[in-house]
Amino acid sequence: RDLRMSRGLGDVYKRQGYEYVFEMDADFSHNPQDLPRLYRACSEEGADVAIGSRYVSGVNVVNWPMGRVLMSYFASKYVRFITGLPIHDTTAGFVCYRRRVLETINLDGIRFKGYAFQIEMKFTAYKCGFKVKEVPVIFINRELGTSKMNSSIFGEAVFGVIRLKWNSWFHKYPTVDKEMK
């Protein structure tokens, strides 16, 4: 993910005035029929961030090689352990954000570029006091194209998560206005 593109998209999302912003893979690994469930988690169940989770109720991944499943699953366990983030699928890219989450988070301050971008967004939302909820989904591997996973993305996630936690001890996160909730 190009950092400039991510920042630019954040600005576009905020300017459009939508109350809810969805992020999903365009290759249909994320089922569009699950969008209403993520929406309801935010609009009716009080979540500020709803995550389409592959791991909240077991492992729900179809057609991934076993090595990829294990790497993804244990990466999320690692992130939970290091950060204390109460999320089972920390790298999920199927997410519904309330507008106020994107308005509160300093999107220019998001540093991760690869899959770790997902971790940093969720961690920052959590540290700001937003309610994060996981919604079980089934993730189906793409039929066309290839993964962007490489050693630099992997290294960013492994070492970046430690740096993210370390920096959180010294960083003052904006807090959610209780009246907004």
Model-derived regions, located:
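Short, hydrophobic secondary-structure boundary micro-motifs
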Residues: A50, D89-T90, E134, F170, ...
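Catalytic donor-sugar/metal-binding loop of nucleotide-sugar-dependent glycosyltransferases
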Residues: P86, G109-K113, K122-F139
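DNA-recognition element of transcription regulators
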Residues: I119
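Terminal low-complexity segments of carbohydrate-biosynthetic enzymes
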Residues: Q33, E44, R100-V101, G129, ...
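The conserved acidic donor/metal-binding loop of glycosyltransferases
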Residues: D25-S29
